[in-house]
Amino acid sequence: MKNYYSVLNECAVKNQVLFAGSTFAHDFPINELMQDFDVDARVYNRSEKGAKLADARDFVMEQAEALEPSKIFLCFGDEDIKAEGFLAGEFSYEYKELVSDIKKKFPDCQI
């Protein structure tokens, strides 16, 4: 996964919101919705087009370590489900493992 976010993360405000996912999340109009609903938080979209959950674990953890968010929204699965040989049980297990890893490293973070 790309790491061009590292420069942006140096300027980011800690204790805000991390939004991480794949194509759907990458294209999601977060800023527009924040304005429409007067959200008083900074949301950092660190999503990658084409990302699959299995490839994203290290990337998500890296972004969380850099941003130290108070909340994390995960939005993976849109690319996984299209992949040949997709197994729902395996995907569910990997998702739970990612959430568990985040909770261990960032116990005060809401997911």
Question: What feature does the model see in each segment?
Answer:
Residues 1-96:
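Conserved SGNH/GDSL esterase-like catalytic core that processes O-acyl groups on lipids
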